[in-house]
Amino acid sequence: YNEILPALKVRGSVEGKKVAIIGGGPAGLAAATFLSRAGVAVTVFERKEQLGGVVRNVIPEFRISADSIDKDVELCKAYGAEFKLGAEVTSVKALKAEGYTDVIVSIGAWKPGRSPLAYGEVTDALEFLMEAKKNGATMNIGKDVVVLGGGNTAMDVARAAKRIPGVEHVRLIYRRTKRYM
């Protein structure tokens, strides 16, 4: 990686194009990498202070390390993409007025699911993972945790919950058999 990164070269030159990318998550970084590699002037606007989106802020460290995410960001920077962190964009029209010829909106499609459970404490999986990643050692979620689902996110929630001090039992409830998990 360290030998290859300095050798990366822009593969072309695209005149008259200046692209703004709203969102520095996986889609925004991918778009920035491919466009800047092709010689397009690219600026990524990220409202948070770090790039990576859900991958950095939600997916647990035991699945992908911060170092791996940082390397992806460095790859994007190696091709010349510019990044503006802590920059929330509220108007595509304003970006166009600043001279951007094209705008890519890659803000993610996060819409928390809501459980139909009438009683008890229910937390959205992505909200839980984000909180566990930031404050897992100090969270108080009780000693018994039930996770609804059997996919990758449910497994991440179960594994993250098991690592929280005070949690004794984590149970998965899934509507199908183990074969379909």
What are these regions (language model features)?
Residues 48:
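Conserved SAM/SAH-binding beta-strand->alpha-helix loop
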Residues 38-39, 61, 120-122, 164:
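Glycine-rich, phosphate-binding/catalytic loops in enzymes
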